[in-house]
């Protein structure tokens, strides 16, 4: 409980109050869930099937470390090498900024690589709220997976380097598609973004302000936030202090007023009335926060 309170931010309340059931479904970014697929040959076949629908960007939110399965590895590499769409693959960045890439990255220089935010600066015990655009590694600038996706989809995109932004979980809903249903979404995938990853298993599940979400969904929402500049901006600290002072002042004044006007009223009723007024003021505070979130 203590950890939960320590990790709480006002933006969490804002996102929690958003009705996710009424959010529009994104018509630009989709997630293909390959949780049920356990071998690289089958994943390669799924990638090829997605590529046949002519998406603009295919993002692989899966790490492929080197191993002994040479035949499956060769099929996967051949598939990636023949796809005309822009392919973005995931990598991991350690605390000392060393990059862990998939085995095929050196052999396929046409692929774009981006580090995944879900394994960077976050742990399973903390709420995943933010994504980063880039990290600077000595003289090199490494781009994140969401940024690489956004740039592949919208090359003229403007972004801030080395920035950490809140993910907008309240803007759109990301449709998850099973491999068996890819053909049904052929028209919707055309010229759009398709993120392929484990979207329903516990292997890539993360705590967010709106509940548990998979890594591919978080990547998709981060990319959507970047593409449409729907970043959430938290209220400045100084304004929070001012509003906190005003709330406390109004609470004390209300208590004093009720005590003077209704001398026979017990203190419990006075306190409850004052709390009611304070709650109304808190809602005003939330409205102010809303304007800052979308400023």
What residues fall within each predicted segment?
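Substrate-access "cap/lid" subdomains that shape
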Residues: 154-184
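Hydrophobic transmembrane alpha-helices
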Residues: 256, 263-294
């Amino acid at each position: 409980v203590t950890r939960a309170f320590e990790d709480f931010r006002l933006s969490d309340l804002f996102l929690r109050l958003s009705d996710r059931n009424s959010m529009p479904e994104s018509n630009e970014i989709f997630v293909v869930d390959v949780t049920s697929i356990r071998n690289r040959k089958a994943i390669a076949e799924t990638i090829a099937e997605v590529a046949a629908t002519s998406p603009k960007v295919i993002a692989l939110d899966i790490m492929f470390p080197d191993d002994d399965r040479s035949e499956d590895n060769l099929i996967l590499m051949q598939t990636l090498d023949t796809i005309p769409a822009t392919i973005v693959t995931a990598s991991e960045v350690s605390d000392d900024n060393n990059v862990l890439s998939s085995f095929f990255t050196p052999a396929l220089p046409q692929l774009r690589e981006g580090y995944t935010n879900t394994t960077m600066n976050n742990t399973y015990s903390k709420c995943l709220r933010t994504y980063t655009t880039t990290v600077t590694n000595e003289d090199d600038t490494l781009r994140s997976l969401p940024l690489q996706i956004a740039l592949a989809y919208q090359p003229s995109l403007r972004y801030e380097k080395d920035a950490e932004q809140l993910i907008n979980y309240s803007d759109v809903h990301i449709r998850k598609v099973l491999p068996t249903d890819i053909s049904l979404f052929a028209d919707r995938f055309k010229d759009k973004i398709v993120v392929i990853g484990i979207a329903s298993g516990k292997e890539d599940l993360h705590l967010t302000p709106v509940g548990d979400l998979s890594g591919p969904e978080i990547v998709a929402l981060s990319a959507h936030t970047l593409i449409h500049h729907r970043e959430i901006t938290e209220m400045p600290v100084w304004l929070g202090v001012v509003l906190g002072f005003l709330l406390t002042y109004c609470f004390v004044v209300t208590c004093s007023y009720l005590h003077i006007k209704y001398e026979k009223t017990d203190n419990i009723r006075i306190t409850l009335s004052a709390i009611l007024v304070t709650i109304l003021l808190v809602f005003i505070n939330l409205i102010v926060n809303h304007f800052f979130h979308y400023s």
